[in-house]
Curated annotation (Swiss-Prot):
Phylogenetic classification of the source organism: Bacteria, Bacillati, Cyanobacteriota, Cyanophyceae, Synechococcales
Pathway in which the depicted protein is active: Glycan biosynthesis; glycogen biosynthesis
The protein, known as: Glycogen synthase
Family membership noted in the UniProt record: Belongs to the glycosyltransferase 1 family. Bacterial/plant glycogen synthase subfamily.
UniProt binding sites for ADP-alpha-D-glucose: 15
Gene: glgA
Length: 499
């Protein structure tokens, strides 16, 4: 199949959140299944210094009253064809923000649509988050291109309809209050980045005012779990670590722990319980819970805590105050450093993710891969990836808590600290996490099956995993809706052939 990925981010060149990881890692996994996969993204200014981009574009077009150019290069890590939409609006270094953010990404979506119609026509156009939300609307009447829309974070929903009407052409049939709603309505298939998140967003608690619409389209909604690149994230070959290690030999983690304590200005002690956190410092990630429980945890246990990330100023200030008040035991770096992040994964004893909501989460997968035991809230993708530790039967890979409350988080932390004191059991807990298979190869099979479904292919893909479908609403029949959607596609193709 010919598949075109359209997104605002693509790791490693442009990465702000988990979407960048998905767009950087899923396409090569699909390409290994013999699909022709290509990517298109805005031509941000910094890309011209990172990639080998020809001077001359392969095509020029016009949309929304502006001319644009399409440049062709290749992804630096996997070699897949990468197209960049060139326009002065993308020249600044910034990815998000600014008064023209809505216009920038609506323009990108429109340019991508023109590219798909005039230059390289895919069978499946895979769109990611609101930045590409208008593409399914414009493609709705094209019988030859099917659209898949992936929800990475429902909270960010794009410009409202009245603003879209001022910026671009909105088809007469378009419904939906904003870009995200329109994408959900008009995409041929919709998926969330974990099965649990797919169920959660159909409730009022997590639906961000779109739960009614999501229940309405539940027949074409499913959850497919994200993965990680097992070659890029391999503690046995990670050159950024002072000492490499694997599930059979964890001795290198002690060297990494000492290096982490030294770099973060903590007291060097191999027996201290060292907790790590690598995160955007925003409300979603539960940083406020950490601020509320830290003093009590440090008073009750011999723990140390390290935090790496940037975000909201108030949360940054609170973490900085804790570091000042607890020298040698609490340390924070208000930046992002990939080498330091890897050292935290490979040197900390446990990893903190007390998220308010979590569509999937990548950090807990990386932490387990590197032998850092996750302490997480039971929400979203964390439910699907971190089974709770059972000391009786010696099962599970992490410590989980239910309510978004300081007392619940604190209790989980104390439970993990007490388990850490039983080193043999703790080592087995680490090893279970390190041997979990969360590769993109497994996820790619699920996406391949969804592509076949949306294109009307009846035969299952070879060795395809069973794709779980969710009947998330009341009064809806998922199989019937899928059949109806495919029937409409076939009808449009037939009409086009008769014309």
């Amino acid at each position: 199949m010919r598949v075109l990925f359209a997104a605002a981010e693509c790791a490693p060149m442009v990465k702000v959140g988990g979407m960048g990881d998905v767009v950087g890692s899923l396409p090569p996994a699909l390409a290994k299944l013999d699909h022709d996969v290509r990517l298109i993204m805005p031509g941000y200014g910094k890309l011209w210094s990172l990639l080998d981009i020809p001077t001359d574009p392969i095509w020029r077009g016009q949309t929304m009253g502006n001319e644009f150019a399409i440049y062709e290069t290749s992804h630096p890590s996997n070699g897949l064809p990468l197209y960049l939409v060139g326009h002065p609006v993308f020249d600044p270094e910034r990815i998000y923000g600014g008064e023209d953010e809505d216009w920038r990404f609506t323009f990108f979506a429109s340019a991508t649509t023109e590219f798909a119609w005039n230059v390289w026509k895919p069978q499946v156009l895979h769109c990611h988050d609101w930045h590409t939300g208008m593409i399914p609307v414009w493609m709705h009447q094209d019988p030859e291109i099917s659209t898949v829309f992936t929800i990475h974070n429902l909270k960010y929903q794009g410009p409202w309809r009245w603003k879209l009407d001022r910026m671009t052409w909105c088809p007469w049939y378009m419904q939906g209050d904003h870009t995200m709603a329109a994408a959900l309505l008009y995409a041929d298939r919709v998926n969330a980045v974990s099965p649990t998140y797919a169920r959660e967003i159909c409730t009022s608690e997590y639906g961000e005012s779109l739960d009614g619409l999501l229940n309405y389209i539940s027949g074409k909604l499913r959850g497919i779990l994200n993965g990680i690149d097992l070659q890029d994230w391999d503690p046995g070959n990670d050159k950024s670590l002072p000492a490499t290690f694997n599930a059979d030999d964890l001795s290198g983690r002690a060297v990494n722990k000492q290096a982490l304590q030294q770099r973060m200005g903590l007291e060097v002690n191999p027996d201290t319980y060292l907790l790590g956190m690598v995160s955007r410092l925003v409300d979603q990630k539960g940083v406020d819970l950490l601020l509320q429980v830290t003093e009590r945890l440090l008073a009750y246990t011999d723990s140390q805590i390290v935090v790496l990330g940037t975000g909201e100023r108030g949360l940054e200030s609170g973490l900085w105050q804790l570091a000042i008040q607890n020298p040698g035991r609490f340390s924070v770096f208000l930046t992002y450093d990939d080498d330091l992040a890897r050292l935290i994964y490979g040197g900390s004893d446990a990893f903190l993710m007390p998220s308010r909501f979590e569509p999937c989460g990548i950090s807990q997968l990386l932490a387990m891969r590197y032998g850092s035991v996750p302490v997480v809230r039971k929400v979203g993708g964390l439910v699907d990836t971190v089974p709770s530790y059972d000391p009786i039967h010696q099962t599970g890979t992490g410590f989980c808590f239910d309510r978004f409350e300081p007392v619940d988080f604190y209790t989980a932390l104390v439970r993990s600290w007490e388990a850490f004191r039983h080193r043999d059991c703790w080592r087995e807990l680490q090893q279970r996490g390190m041997t979990q298979n969360y590769s993109w190869d497994r996820s790619a099979l699920d996406y391949e099956q969804m592509y076949r479904d949306v294109c009307g292919f009846k035969e299952p893909s070879p060795d395809a995993a069973v794709v779980e479908q969710f009947s998330l609403g009341q009064g809806s029949d998922p199989s019937r809706q899928n059949q109806d959607s495919n029937a409409k596609k076939r009808t449009r193709r037939k009409k086009k052939g008769n014309d």
